[in-house]
Amino acid sequence: MNQSKPTVNPPLWLLAELTYRCPLQCPYCSNPLDFARQDKELTTEQWIEVFRQARAMGSVQLGFSGGEPLTRKDLPELIRAARDLGFYTNLITSGIGLTESKLDAFSEAGLDHIQISFQASDEVLNAALAGNKKAFQQKLTMAKAVKARDYPMVLNFVLHRHNIDQLDKIIELCIELEADDVELATCQFYGWAFLNREGLLPTREQIARAEQVVADYRQKMAASGNLTNLLFVTPDYYEERPKGCMGGWGSIFLSVTPEGTALPCHSARQLPVAFPSVLEQSLESIWYDSFGFNRYRGYDWMPEPCRSCDEKEKDFGGCRCQAFMLTGSADNADPVCSKSPHHHKILEARREAACSDIKVSQLQFRNRTRSQLIYQTRDL
């Protein structure tokens, strides 16, 4: 009998990464660098079975993500199946490929919520970052169409050194589009963002200015009765304590990749840990019994100084993927923490950001050709 079941809660949030296909080339994409090697995708029926198992375990929220989930022709069918099972459903999209007829189909299928991402507040920078000259106008048109259909609408802007100084214009755009919520999420350095970190990490001064801009707008909007919610997420590279990543490893979040690998966070597949496939094991068995999902649960795995730290119940030892990327071992204390013996790695990144002169055009953009080239080079 599995003794861990009574103490491990079910995954409340399921993220379905339906595909790695995407019409954009954002240099901060969280998809794996080797996505070009991974062409397989779960079928409609296989995804619906994943939803059924997750719902039976107690999952309540389902996000459709990618890549770009709109590239899946069966998306309305998947939305309907999820809604019939009782999920609250959220479409996380770039808006590229979205049409008014698709919005109507999604509404009829029962979609609850839509999040549209922008790269910048102006067409020129948006095009440079997305690798698509028509993207900005398409996003504007679809954001207005989403709002016209009374969807709760979130606009998402990934902030970095090349767009963070236009934060006031970004917020003004969100107000104009009547967003319900605005995610001003400073770049999290995983996947392609980690590859481009030196050219993306804002300086400490940029972060401080951005925090003040957000504070000023919150005050101004509250005074005018504007109910748009501004969520500003700072990079933990400028913190002294790590984030409680995903609310704790294998605690509330479960992600399934396009080909069916189950993960406790978006980036965990890069770790030297075996994660099972939903095609080979049930979700229940994966969540409660698999080595991968139990590897960093609780506190027994922790090294010092985490093991004896009085803050471990807040941050759960920090991010395992970040520890792996920066130190070579996921077992190490997250270098973000000032108590970590590897904190100098974060200090080095801050110094690099302070003197970086990398232009947008010099970033490595997320596309199939670049993905193939990276791994051809690494395999030599």
Swiss-Prot record:
GO molecular-function term, one example from the UniProt record: oxidoreductase activity
Keyword Zinc-finger: no
Cofactor note: Binds 1 [4Fe-4S] cluster. The cluster is coordinated with 3 cysteines and an exchangeable S-adenosyl-L-methionine.
One Pfam family hit: SPASM
Residues that, per the record, bind [4Fe-4S] cluster: 22, 26, 29
Binding partners and assembly: Interacts with PqqD. The interaction is necessary for activity of PqqE.
Function description: Catalyzes the cross-linking of a glutamate residue and a tyrosine residue in the PqqA protein as part of the biosynthesis of pyrroloquinoline quinone (PQQ).
Protein name: PqqA peptide cyclase
Biological classification of the source: Bacteria, Pseudomonadati, Pseudomonadota, Gammaproteobacteria, Enterobacterales
Gene this chain is encoded by: pqqE
